[in-house]
A protein has these predicted regions:
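Short, structured "edge-of-domain" segments at secondary-structure transitions
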Residues: 1-197
Length: 197
């Protein structure tokens, strides 16, 4: 299945892996936020902007033939949070977990799962920071390239980040607190680099 999360927090699931999530129709000015490919018997894990992790069985999500449904109907999230990330995997699959404040760590899928509707505290965020999308880590990934909104680029070995069940993580890129608070500087994105890329 392909699990699709929209920017407005609507969720749905399409059969197979061939579907292009960008080609689906979205409500009004809503658009794609994130998607994940997996199996229908796996749990889909969603991260919100406050650093909480939630799980929903993939097979129970509404069909992508329609617009889906608001994820908040399935979960009891704090008011005003955005859902930023969708992931599907098996126990020891690894994901790069990061926030706009410049911190990150590697998490195993089994530690991202929550059996509570209210989710579980997963990443401790610096003040004024928000979660970024979780990025699947493959066996051949060796380096992380992190980029700030003002174009700072840092490339380092993936082994430099700890593997954690939850927590704050390590500083990936230096973001001054005052600039983060003012919205002037933040970690915008990271890319994983492989030995054969």
């Amino acid at each position: 299945v392909t699990v699709v999360l929209s920017k407005a927090g609507w969720v749905r699931s399409a059969k197979g892996h061939e579907i292009d999530p960008n080609s689906l129709s979205y409500r009004g000015d809503d658009s794609l936020q994130d998607f994940a490919r997996g199996k229908s018997n796996q749990l889909a894990v969603f991260l919100d902007s406050n650093g909480k992790a939630y799980s929903i069985p993939s097979h129970s999500l509404p069909s992508a033939r329609g617009m889906g449904e608001p994820i908040t109907g399935r979960l009891s999230a704090d008011s005003g949070v955005k859902f930023v990330s969708a992931s599907v995997g098996v126990d020891d699959d690894r994901f790069l977990i990061m926030n706009t404040g410049g911190y990150g760590y590697i998490a195993e899928y089994k530690n991202m799962i929550s059996n509570k509707k209210s989710g579980r505290a997963f990443m401790r965020l610096p003040e004024n920071a928000e979660m970024l999308k979780a990025i699947p880590v493959r066996k051949n990934h060796t380096h992380i390239a992190a980029v700030s909104n003002i174009g700072k680029l840092l490339i380092f070995e993936i082994d430099e980040l700890p593997i954690l069940g939850k927590g704050k993580g390590n500083k990936i890129i230096n973001i001054p607190k005052d600039k983060l608070a003012a919205g002037e500087e933040f970690m915008a994105h990271a890319q994983l680099l492989a030995t054969d890329s």
